[in-house]
């Protein structure tokens, strides 16, 4: 049976309310086999018992204008063989017909279903006759405290009375005004679109405090169910979930019991996911056996803020990624002097909160807590949301990607940013007994904030970060990250290591350099006309040992440093400590003689339009270095299968075919 068929079967069970009676806050659903199983939450008024024989035909009664004798027979079965005009007779004061009085006064369940079914024979004109208030008989059920809800359900579910959208709105308003919360719940199960009208009705109608609280609860729960449903089960399940909540059966156990009773297929995965998210509590991370004890220890240190202490500006989106969306927000705290202060923060809300996804979110939280403030933004804590939770971190001005794009970058700023970046990586690799690898270093994941004294640069998004341990070997071998920045050794099934982060850092340096030299930000390997898709462009470039072209006028020491960070052979790359030392040396060299580093627009234009001998020699030198290394190291025998271009003529011909020539 498909998910759709499953939904239809279960929805039918949810909607076919066999016996409904009113309690103070919920609607109870019972299947009644006989009179003994009927359980009422409120005591029934005493019924007048007649000693004379029961009168079964209302045609034999002489009715008074105000139906004064209806109370004498309203608890018994009705004979519908009398003249139909009789049922249209109206009370002179209220204008109520027989059916109005029936809906208002009926107190016995005996033969109730058959009596309501027999009303169909009276015809639409009779059934939908209106009183002096222009109300059909359905409105009279509001005054029936004993069986009003039951009669309303029978009239609607048996299609005895049909009400259009305007009629539903009027009935909903009347139910709210009368405080008939039970009927409001039922009407929502009939037409879930009425939910959207509750707030508007509350604004224009005078309602009791109890009713207002009920409307607020209904709206908040519906928003929660919609938010979960759209992400987990889809729109088709939202109505089913909410109906179960309204009927008071919103628990996994009750649905499973229904499945067993009706011998339905096993519960769909969508509903399993839904219940996990709906019933999720912040402390549930201790139940996730997939989380290692060392992570649990870090997570337990994180502060949990109530939602009232945090405001989230949903319209002010700071960033979006595959693992979540970051919003601007404000955290209210009390300072040492007892004054309330507002702290600008960023709030990351994970995309999904299923069990499998939560494990990854908690791992990210644990690493964030472990390196808190050392090489990443400060972690304030978490806030429990309507659905799941949000991660509260220090707010920065922008990402490095946006900073490069919107600012002029010279070599002074290049060295300032590059040094801060590589020092951050060094701190990340050394801040724990087991090294921590970021695994997704790129300009988008660097945050920049300008203070009075300095430019602060930190790493963000630790969703892929992992410790260097034996238990993480399988994870460190997986192909993860952003294509252009992924180190080439991952294609060769080599474990992610410290120097893998260095490769991604080197590619980020190239993007900085492009802005310094060309005045605009370009993606790495943009010179090569291989493919419009970044992934394929990167793969082809790496397989053929190409590197981004660096202007030849720059000092050789600087070019060698950049090339070393992006070396195809990871063992030939410098580690983070060596990168810091070499950058400091290069910065000193730059400050001593800036004329060597001046951007020569004429040379740049020539190199962008033609393949100069220096560029060809540069590529030849790099490829021959790889060739020599491969021949001397059996460990990299897999590289020998790759086609290499070693002669200068072959390199020139190859580069000419893929370089993007610009006039």
UniProtKB/Swiss-Prot annotation:
Binding site for ATP: 318-326, 348
Catalytic activity from the UniProt record: L-seryl-[protein] + ATP = O-phospho-L-seryl-[protein] + ADP + H(+); L-threonyl-[protein] + ATP = O-phospho-L-threonyl-[protein] + ADP + H(+)
Family, per entry: Belongs to the protein kinase superfamily. Ser/Thr protein kinase family.
Protein name per UniProt: Probable serine/threonine-protein kinase DDB_G0283301
Active site: 440 (proton acceptor)
Source superkingdom: Eukaryota
The EC number(s) this enzyme carries: 2.7.11.1
């Amino acid at each position: 049976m498909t998910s759709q068929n499953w939904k239809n079967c279960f929805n039918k069970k949810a909607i076919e309310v066999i016996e409904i009676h009113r309690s103070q806050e919920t609607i109870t659903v019972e299947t009644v086999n006989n009179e003994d199983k009927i359980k009422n939450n409120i005591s029934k008024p005493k019924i007048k018992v007649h000693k004379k024989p029961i009168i079964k035909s209302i045609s034999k009664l002489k009715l008074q204008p105000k139906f004064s004798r209806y109370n004498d027979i309203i608890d018994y079965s009705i004979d519908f063989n009398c003249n139909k005009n009789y049922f249209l007779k109206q009370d002179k004061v209220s204008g109520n017909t027989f059916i109005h009085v029936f809906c208002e006064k009926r107190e016995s369940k005996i033969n109730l279903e058959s009596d309501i079914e027999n009303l169909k024979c009276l015809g639409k004109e009779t059934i939908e006759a209106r009183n002096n208030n222009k109300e059909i008989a359905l409105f009279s059920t509001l005054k029936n405290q004993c069986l009003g809800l039951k009669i309303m359900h029978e009239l609607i579910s048996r299609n005895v009375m049909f009400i259009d959208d305007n009629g539903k709105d009027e009935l909903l308003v009347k139910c709210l005004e009368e405080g008939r919360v039970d009927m409001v719940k039922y009407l929502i199960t009939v037409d879930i679109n009425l939910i959207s009208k509750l707030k508007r009705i509350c604004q224009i109608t005078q309602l009791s405090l109890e009713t207002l609280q009920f409307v607020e609860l209904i709206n908040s729960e519906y928003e929660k169910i919609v938010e979960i449903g759209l992400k987990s089960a889809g729109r088709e399940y939202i109505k089913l979930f909410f109906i179960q909540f309204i009927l008071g059966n919103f628990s996994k156990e009750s649905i499973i019991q229904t499945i067993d009773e009706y011998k339905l297929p096993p519960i769909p995965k969508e509903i399993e996911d839904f219940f996990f998210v709906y019933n999720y509590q912040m402390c549930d991370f201790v139940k996730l056996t997939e989380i290692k004890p060392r992570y649990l220890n870090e997570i337990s240190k994180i502060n949990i803020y109530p939602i009232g202490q945090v405001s989230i500006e949903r319209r002010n989106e700071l960033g979006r990624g595959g693992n979540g969306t970051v919003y601007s927000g404000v955290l209210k705290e009390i300072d040492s002097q007892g004054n309330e202060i507002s702290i600008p923060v960023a709030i990351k809300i994970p995309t999904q909160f299923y069990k499998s996804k939560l494990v990854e979110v908690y791992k990210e939280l644990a690493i964030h807590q472990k390196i808190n403030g050392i090489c990443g933004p400060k972690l304030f804590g978490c806030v429990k949301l309507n659905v799941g939770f949000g991660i509260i971190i220090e707010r920065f001005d922008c990402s490095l990607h946006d900073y490069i794009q919107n600012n002029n970058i010279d070599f002074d700023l290049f060295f300032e940013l590059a040094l801060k970046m590589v020092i951050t990586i060094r701190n990340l690799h050394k801040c724990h007994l087991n090294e921590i690898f970021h695994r997704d270093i790129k300009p988008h994941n660097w945050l920049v904030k300008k203070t009075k004294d300095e430019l602060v640069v930190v790493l963000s998004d630790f969703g892929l970060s992992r410790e260097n341990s034996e238990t993480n070997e399988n994870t460190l071998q997986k192909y993860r990250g952003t294509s252009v920045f992924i180190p080439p050794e991952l294609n060769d099934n080599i474990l992610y290591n410290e120097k893998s982060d260095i490769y991604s850092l080197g590619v980020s340096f190239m993007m900085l350099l492009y802005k310094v030299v060309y005045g605009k930000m370009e993606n790495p390997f943009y010179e090569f006309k291989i493919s419009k898709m970044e992934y394929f462009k990167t793969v082809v470039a790496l397989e053929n040992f190409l590197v981004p072209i660096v202007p030849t006028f720059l000092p050789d020491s600087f070019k060698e440093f950049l090339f070393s960070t992006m070396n195809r052979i990871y063992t030939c790359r410098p580690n983070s400590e060596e990168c810091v030392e070499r950058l400091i040396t290069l910065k000193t060299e730059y400050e001593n003689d800036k004329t060597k580093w001046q951007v020569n627009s004429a040379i740049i234009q020539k190199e962008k339009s033609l393949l100069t001998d220096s560029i060809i020699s540069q590529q030849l030198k790099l490829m021959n270095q790889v060739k020599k290394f491969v021949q001397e190291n059996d460990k990299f025998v897999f590289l020998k299968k790759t086609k290499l271009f070693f002669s200068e003529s072959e390199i020139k011909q190859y580069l000419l075919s893929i370089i993007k020539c610009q006039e």
